[in-house]
Curated annotation (Swiss-Prot):
This is Urease accessory protein UreE. InterPro entries: UreE, UreE_C_dom, UreE_N, UreE_N_sf. Pfam families: UreE_C (PF05194), UreE_N (PF02814). Belongs to the UreE family. Disulfide bonds: none annotated. GO terms for cellular component: cytoplasm. Involved in urease metallocenter assembly. Binds nickel. Probably functions as a nickel donor during metallocenter assembly. Residues 170-196 have a biased composition (Basic and acidic residues). It comes from Burkholderia mallei (strain NCTC 10247). It is found in: Cytoplasm. It comes from the Bacteria. GO terms for molecular function: nickel cation binding; unfolded protein binding. The keyword Cytoplasm applies.
Length: 209
């Protein structure tokens, strides 16, 4: 069994014909978040995926097997929810509440896409959004700073929040003063693979005493 253990950096240009000839590894989002995986190429060949921990594969990524051969990643069709709204405010509220639940979201033009979840579908409907179940590739937003799960007590989250607030102030002419006081006397162990994108701006306030 071949082992796939390298991902070519997205900024490395490869000949289109070379990539097109490479066999595809078609995976749903959950599988693309796993760095250790037994998988099957579209050709029927079984392979072992062994990538650095924390790697999240995206549609179009190119991988390298231990024999030097290339493998291209394809996002599989999976059960998703397509969320639309009659106005921008309702769609923004939907994005806010999804962000509060750390839900991975793919942002489209006038539409949000997320993994199928009947509880979330009910919540979004109550908010006034139109929710449609569909089968489609799912590729949620990546973090603005390249990270994954964000919390209010993370330094990178503070940067994201400050940037979002700056943009808001520039557009609305407001000046807001925010004070964050976080006193942590206990450890947190968060193991989340999903990611939030910059287009889904939301605030998280964690006050631990």
């Amino acid at each position: 069994m071949r082992t796939i253990d390298k991902r070519i950096a997205p900024n490395v240009r490869l000949a289109a014909t070379l990539v097109a000839r490479a066999p595809a590894l078609t995976l749903a989002y959950d599988a693309r978040c796993k760095s250790r995986l037994a998988a099957t190429l579209d050709t029927g060949e079984d392979v072992a995926l062994v990538l650095p921990r924390g790697t999240v594969l995206r549609d179009g990524d190119v991988l390298v097997a231990d024999d030097g051969a290339l493998v291209r990643v394809a996002a599989a069709h999976e059960a998703v929810l397509l969320v639309r709204a009659p106005d921008a405010l309702t769609l923004t509220r939907a994005a806010y509440h999804l962000g509060n639940r750390h839900t991975p979201v793919e942002v489209g033009a006038g539409c949000l896409k997320l993994e199928y979840d009947p509880a979330l579908a009910d919540m979004l409907t109550r908010l006034g959004a139109t929710v449609e179940r569909a089968s489609a590739p799912f590729q949620p937003e990546a973090g603005a700073y390249g990270g994954g799960h964000r919390h209010g007590h993370d330094a990178t989250f503070a940067e994201d929040y400050a940037l979002a607030q700056q943009v808001f102030d520039e557009h609305h002419g407001h000046s807001h003063s925010h004070s964050h006081d976080h006193d942590h006397d206990h450890d947190h162990d968060h193991d989340h693979d999903h990611q939030h994108g910059p287009s889904c701006s939301h605030g998280h306030h964690h006050g631990h005493r």
